[in-house]
A protein has these predicted regions:
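Active-site entrance/lid segments in N-terminal catalytic domains of soluble metabolic enzymes
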Residues: 1-138
Length: 138
């Protein structure tokens, strides 16, 4: 689950448990934070339709932010959340009152503004996008 849905302490504890147990922790779609990395455990970085943590200020996929985070030694896999199935046609919404500075920083969204995870399917921004996500050495 994402930072915000879970506290910093909960994410730290989960990552320590993942490291000790030999399993991976999933970030949730809210982005990769230092709290997910705290215990040295393996990470499955989830990217959803809102591109949180890997987006431009305009909300588009940012291949440079993606590459920087994907290269982290603890990130062992990347999960692409293809759509918001729990709320078809609506998407997920984090109310503006919950978008504090720290959450805004990790998600790459403005502080104090409603944060929407679109219901639409995950889009690769260019026909060659699969190669950009995979990287040149894949």
């Amino acid at each position: 689950m994402s930072f915000g849905a879970l506290s910093a302490n909960a994410l730290r504890a989960l990552n320590i448990a993942a490291a000790r147990g030999g399993f991976a922790q999933v970030t949730g779609e809210g982005g990769l934070t230092p709290y997910h990395l705290h215990g040295g455990g393996d990470i499955i970085w989830e990217i959803g339709s809102g591109y949180f943590g890997t987006r431009t200020s305009g909300g588009q996929f940012d291949p440079h932010r993606f590459a920087d985070k994907a290269a982290h030694e603890q990130v062992k896999a990347i999960s692409l959340k293809l759509s918001q199935g729990a709320k078809p046609g609506v998407g997920g919404v984090l109310p503006a009152s919950k978008v504090r500075a720290e959450i805004a920083e990790y998600r790459g969204v403005p502080v104090g503004e409603k944060c929407v995870s679109p219901c639409g399917a995950f889009r690769v921004p260019h026909p060659a996008g699969d190669d950009r996500i995979r990287g040149p050495d894949a």
